[in-house]
Amino acid sequence: MVIISHKKNTVNNLRHSKELLLLCSSMLLIACSSAPARTGTVTSVSGDNRAPTTATIKANSQVAKQLNLNDQQDFTDARRGLIASPKDLKIPSSKDASKNVWNMSAYDFIEGGAPATVNPSLWRQAQLNNIQGLFEVTPGIYQVRGFDLSNMTLIKGDSGWIIIDTMTSKETARYAYDFAMQHLAKRYPNTTNVSAILFTHSHVDHFGGVLGIVSQQDIERKKIPIIAPAGFIEEATSENIIAGNAMLRRAVYMYGKDLARDEFGHIDTGLGKSPAFGEVSITKPTVLIDRTPTKLNIDGVKFEFQYTPESEAPAELTFYLPEYKAFGGAELVSRNMHNLYTLRGAKVRDALKWSGYIEEARNIFGDADIYFGSHHWPMWGQDNIQKFLKQQRDTYKFIHDQSVRRMNKGMTPGEIAEDITLPTSLSQEFYNREYYGTVKHNARAVYQGYLGWYDGNPAH
């Protein structure tokens, strides 16, 4: 067992109060801002431009023929264990109640068959991400899904609730937690307190809502453990302060923040609906996980941690709950192809390490009968989980290896991106589809990771 007190690393890790203040201020700006020169506007397509072109119709038709869109297993899994679902889910801003930081009702149009304007595979993913509410993964483990881009997972401890990831904003986290307690209190009377918080990684949609569910004073007074991967504060700081303004502008564009929510505009981001643009917070970890395996007993629940730095996030972990035979995969795996390079801008992710961590998880947590993650819906059955992990492992490894092979032959990033396609054994799986990351973008990322931006052309 390795437990590292954050107090021992105060000066080096945080530069403490100043840096946290800067971080929170920066993230608040990021969360509350919108695209330059278009503040408060929504961009919609109108007139003759609304009709899909012949090329679009043909391309979407080809996708429909390639995939088994009648496969309902994902829908069965996404609805499994539903306890309650809110009606007309809108979460107001804490700063201006007339504005919403989250509006799931805007996506009510996503039903039935895919319209001609939308890729049918993406439409299917959007329908799945529309399934919202409080769900029982297994007795003792619950998830709130569809209240933010990411999930909040609640694990019943001896004295309270262990919270895994606290969403993007204080508003969405508070709303999600209150909704969960409203229904879970019937099963677990007099248990509405937070006994521990775990951040799986250093991206804001997994920690930004923390002070919405518990105050800093309560964290300190009640000595609530805050568990995170080593490097968490440093990476959250570097991403949101140093490059925050540039990332914001690009994130607004990448996520289509100002697009109208309709079949001609915004329907989904693959990973979820969209980020919540609300008030963001952070708190200092008290326990850092820096090696595999690390075993902790958290409020009576046994955790086995896998430390996975420089994978989907610079600082990340996954965990296994042996008493439940449940694998908490964080964002190491998800039900879409992830990105090795995010268009909002970030450090390039190492596909080789990433695929290696998935293989490691597959081996050390091979008894898992349940998988749940920081996004999307769970999976049940050891064989299903093993196949899922193998397929995701092979997807990132294939993109890495084939990009490197072409790179060493002298091909440019653009040439590599156009030349690589996933084999059908991988591409036919819905959880490997290019809803969020793409093969073209990821191939360029592999090149950038090894050789940088220069493509070998003297004119450049």
Where are these regions (language model features)?
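Metallo-beta-lactamase
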Residues: 136, 227, 233-309, 353-365
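Active-site metal-binding motif and surrounding structural segment of the metallo-beta-lactamase
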Residues: 159-160, 171-225
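C-terminal motif of bacterial Sec signal peptides marking the signal peptidase cleavage site
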Residues: 30-31
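Active-site neighborhood of phospho(di)ester-bond hydrolases with catalytic His/Asp-centered motifs
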Residues: 164-166, 193-205, 227-229, 327-330, ...
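N-terminal pre-domain segments of enzymes
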Residues: 38-126, 130, 358
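Bacterial N-terminal signal peptides that target proteins for export
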Residues: 6-21
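Divalent-metal (often Zn2+) His-rich catalytic cores of metallo-beta-lactamase-fold enzymes
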Residues: 45-64, 295, 326, 336, ...
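Conserved beta-strand hairpin/beta-sheet module of binuclear metal-dependent hydrolase folds
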Residues: 127-187, 317-320, 325-331
